[in-house]
């Protein structure tokens, strides 16, 4: 494939490559790396002025921040192997002290263990989690489109599905937060029930998405974007 920069007729640059990968996020970079390892020539095109996609690190007012993805899970064997190959060091998550919960009305509460909500809300949370686990168990995480109801499930907004299971706003907000803000980094009306099922299926069950000993295990020295 030939790539041509036609913005200036006097400064045309042509590149001959076997494959063009669109997007320099994690998927694009891994794809390009594997193609190169297989002996192909590759060009990666990225519209932004940086690589890494949802992994993004910045220094703001002299302090280093990871704005995007940053965690290394205990069961992410492929990522850990890559970190070893690149000589990247990790450090454990801070585990001491209380957790902080901000309720829907803005009240700040410190807690350990379960969320500081009513028993009824806890029951509604469990109801939604059980329903999501049951659906996630029905799909192949490597090929979710093969589910017999894939098109139907992909046409249902996750927010709509949650609202149909419970009228407990606090319970919905908590489950919504884990999948939407915590995992997929976008509002729950912007993705489908099928995508939520895939997220849970990729971790085997919902509990693994929120287990701090599994999901939020380590971080990378220098930030995940440096990988």
Regions inferred by a protein language model and the residue ranges of each:
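FAD-dinucleotide binding site
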Residues: 1-227
